[in-house]
């Protein structure tokens, strides 16, 4: 990845902070992974603040496979089985069965219907009966350790939500070019400028977490020493 393209966005720490600010403001964030992995840029929105307009943007500008990133706890709460028992995909992406809201939708495919499905799935009191299967929203189960356990967009999404102080559920979709090819970093940056979305990398987020959590452990150890 050509890191020099990200220089205008500041340091890795500053890029993550800009992303967190955008999430808290209800805006989207663009997250890019490594060249030796998917080498793709995803649009990410917080599930709890997601609007029909934002969903329409993802449907229009992205691959169309809109995914809802969930924690293992939420997947269990909704009793969502994994899509396959033996996951042989290269990156072991944690797809569960697809979902549709049991109430409040028509065909389930419109932007408004997909938002309804997502809001239903992340509601505090959500139960399995609130969802039908199959559907037009693709849930993804995140690694419990976030990007420190798996360098994926799914985990980056959950980490961003948690660090932003929001519910740990987010929506992502892979950004594509007009010709249907996957958007790489140069195209992602152009898109970000057009739609006022900050750009960061999964490695930025991993470094941010390591620094923050290491600092927390150090401070806690010092406090214990003082008390002792």
Curated annotation (Swiss-Prot):
Chain sites annotated for binding D-ribulose 5-phosphate: 37-38, 42, 150-154, 174
Annotated keywords: Lyase, Magnesium, Manganese, Metal-binding, Riboflavin biosynthesis
InterPro entries according to UniProt: DHBP_synth_RibB-like_a/b_dom (IPR017945), DHBP_synthase_RibB (IPR000422)
Stored Gene3D superfamilies: DHBP synthase
Binding-site residues for Mg(2+) 1, renumbered to this chain: 38
GO biological process terms on file: riboflavin biosynthetic process
Source superkingdom: Bacteria
Entry's cofactor comment: Binds 2 divalent metal cations per subunit. Magnesium or manganese.
Residues the entry annotates as binding Mg(2+) 2: 38, 153
GO terms of molecular function: 3,4-dihydroxy-2-butanone-4-phosphate synthase activity; magnesium ion binding; manganese ion binding
Pathway terms, separated by semicolons: Cofactor biosynthesis; riboflavin biosynthesis; 2-hydroxy-3-oxobutyl phosphate from D-ribulose 5-phosphate: step 1/1
Keyword Manganese: yes
Reaction(s) this enzyme catalyzes, per UniProt: D-ribulose 5-phosphate = (2S)-2-hydroxy-3-oxobutyl phosphate + formate + H(+)
Entry GO CC: cytosol
Cofactor(s) recorded in Swiss-Prot or TrEMBL: Mg(2+); Mn(2+)
EC number: 4.1.99.12
Site (Essential for catalytic activity): 136, 174
Family according to the record: Belongs to the DHBP synthase family.
PANTHER family recorded: 3,4-DIHYDROXY-2-BUTANONE 4-PHOSPHATE SYNTHASE, GTP CYCLOHYDROLASE II-RELATED
Function: Catalyzes the conversion of D-ribulose 5-phosphate to formate and 3,4-dihydroxy-2-butanone 4-phosphate.
SUBUNIT field: Homodimer.
Protein name: 3,4-dihydroxy-2-butanone 4-phosphate synthase
UniProt organism field: Photobacterium profundum (strain SS9)
Gene for this chain: ribB
